[in-house]
Amino acid sequence: MTSSANLRPDIVLIGAGIMGATFGTLLKELNPSYSMMMFERLSDCGQESSQSWNNAGTGHAANCELNYTPQRPDGTVEITQALRVNTEFDLSRQLWSYLVTKGAIPDPQSFIHPCPHMSMVWGAENVAFLKARFQAMSAHHCYHGMEYTEDGAQIEKWAPLTMEGRDPAEPVAATRIITGTDVDYGSLTHLLVAHLKAQPDFDLHYNTEVEGLDREPDGRWRVTFKDVNSGERHSVSAGFVFIGAGGASIDLLQKSNIPEGKGYGGFPVSGIWLRCDVDAVTQRHHAKVYGKASSGSPPMSVPHLDTRVIDGKTSLLFGPYAGFSTKFLKHGSLTDLFGSITLHNIGPLLDVGRHNIELTEYLIAQVLQTHHHQFEMLKAFFPNAKRADWKEAVAGQRVQVIKPYPDGGGFLEFGTEIVPAADHSLVALLGASPGASTAAAIALEVLEACFADRLTDDAWLPALKRIIPTYGIDLREDAEACRASRAATASVLNIDNI
């Protein structure tokens, strides 16, 4: 705390995960003169949900995740949500390509790798659903190149482990799109934070926990923080505060005391993976294969068998198995859930409990699952799997948003919720899904919510369009812009394009 800029930063970023790193990077590109401070409770960046093994690492483009494409009563499939997620991933690709081109990210293969995305189902009813889904998606330019088959021999060519040992009489179907990716969001977070650290007027503080957010008379924010090792406390006066602290965001939003945050709560869902590092197995599977979730299960619990490339090493991941913990962070406290309950959100919390019995029953069943039952679930995807080849790994915590109704009730929101202060001086990010893949789209939403007056031709808009060339263009409607953008970003990122 040696200079006046350090004592009165323009921007404070709370949380050194993929969201804080992405938003900080974008904001610094738009206004390099901003002074910024980033606070992280842990000893390094990207150690919670952004950490490589704490998430699935899918470049979520809604290619293979069946929960984005619900079936209508007439048997047809709704793809509106899938198209939104699909084109939001394009925004991330454009931001990453910009950073690679300018040299901020030296090697794209340090965080992203080509990996086909597949959906696979079995049973006549599920096959009919996947066929209807393919018919709807393949007719749209955003899903150009998607393949479909009900031929077990063809599926075996695409993903051999999924078919070997399977009953040949069982109906199966799969879709594949070869333009999919595997993304190491932990590595990407480190790359973004390293780039930020190299910028002028950027201060990074690890092992630092934000304890207070208080309004000052001039409208700025008094941010009080503690060194978790020494216990020393300091404070700064911030012009704008970005709360991107994952599961800790609920608590920080409550500390800010903004009226817009009243009533929000959190529901934590934990996850467990099975992981295989045996080369003889991992070398025979190159895809992310998503199945169909059980009825009542949350979106993050769609089972999938994935190729993962982390630190240059290829592994396989299967899961997740959902669970319940009262922690809001993997490195959090068992009292997190109880500490988050206030007079303002207890009504919405109780309302959600009453109206989500199916989810509650699902989580209880998952928690009570034995290792045998978990492995049987893997064998539904990989019939010849050997127990000795797989070990258990604990995923990151996902805190789903409980959003208040005006009447005092509430509902469970599985997306990402942006909660800005009325004067745009503070914003909190809540929720977990779809998460890191759409970090650029979420960062743009924050810009539009809190910096709308700067998004003009005589301010930030020209620079923003250099970073995100399709900003302001709906890629769901403009097929040519979509094709051109994907060709350009695939070339820079060295990923597949068709």
Curated annotation (Swiss-Prot):
Family matches, as SUPFAM superfamilies: FAD/NAD(P)-binding domain
Keywords: FAD, Flavoprotein, Oxidoreductase, Tricarboxylic acid cycle
Catalytic reaction equation(s): (S)-malate + a quinone = a quinol + oxaloacetate
Entry-linked InterPro entries: FAD/NAD-bd_sf (IPR036188), MQO (IPR006231)
GO molecular function terms noted in the UniProt entry: 2-hydroxyglutarate dehydrogenase activity; L-malate dehydrogenase (quinone) activity
Enzyme Commission no: 1.1.5.4
Cofactor(s) annotated in UniProt: FAD
Recorded metabolic or biological pathway in which this protein acts: Carbohydrate metabolism; tricarboxylic acid cycle; oxaloacetate from (S)-malate (quinone route): step 1/1
Name used for this protein in its record: Probable malate:quinone oxidoreductase
Superkingdom of the source species: Bacteria
Coiled coil: none
One biological process term in Gene Ontology: tricarboxylic acid cycle
Family: Belongs to the MQO family.
Pfam families, per database record: Mqo (PF06039)
Cited Gene3D superfamilies: D-Amino Acid Oxidase, subunit A, domain 2 (3.30.9.10), FAD/NAD(P)-binding domain (3.50.50.60)
HAMAP family named among the record's database cross-references: MQO
Enzyme class: oxidoreductase
Protein source organism: Granulibacter bethesdensis (strain ATCC BAA-1260 / CGDNIH1)
